[in-house]
Amino acid sequence: GLVRDDGDRVQEMHDRQAQAPTRRIPQRAPAAPSAPTGLEGLREAATHCRRCPLWEPATRTVFGQGPADARIMLVGEQPGDAEDLSGHPFVGPAGQLLDRALREVGIDRHTLYLTNAVKHFRFERRGKRRIHTPPQVTHITACRDWLMGEIENVRPQVIVCLGATAASAVFGAGFTLKEHRGRWHSLDDGTRAFATVHPAWVLRQGEGEAREAAYRLLLEDLQRLVDDHPAP
């Protein structure tokens, strides 16, 4: 669960980084020489993260972006190819589909804090192309302190998890998207949260009716967000 305790959690994050490697997260190393404070401090520290091997082939760390006091936080899986190259979350094809869905339900993207459960692009090469590969549990676990730090600093009223990876990072490994999609849950600190499909999953449904049906699921859940938590 999530418990808001900014100072303690940031300190614990660095205490754990300084420990010897554990079986759960190999190659754990300090993210930065001093404990980060605030979103910008976390962002800078994350650029030095070596907790898992994903940093090495990736172009850069892709940290979250958006207002530091955003009312709504969207959490995705990991950066894609476009995000890895640009350094900005949700700017590739999935991000463009998300933008379309947000516009349709009347949500201004610029009011949201957008981030991912994993901060580096995991991929495999096929010729000159870099093909997305889902992150493993070790990658999600290695990045979880960064996500928790973002949540604790932004303190959103609502968290929307896009896809199963984001949901497992926020709710825990036992959470299943099939069973809980679109249903509100309260985190330990009182933050309301729910999970919906990832726009990248919508794109993978091909063309025609299958994709439209998948897109309607995303729209339906975002509309629920608007209905249950209207902008002030």
Residue positions per predicted region:
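A polyanion-binding, active-site-adjacent surface
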Residues: G1-P232
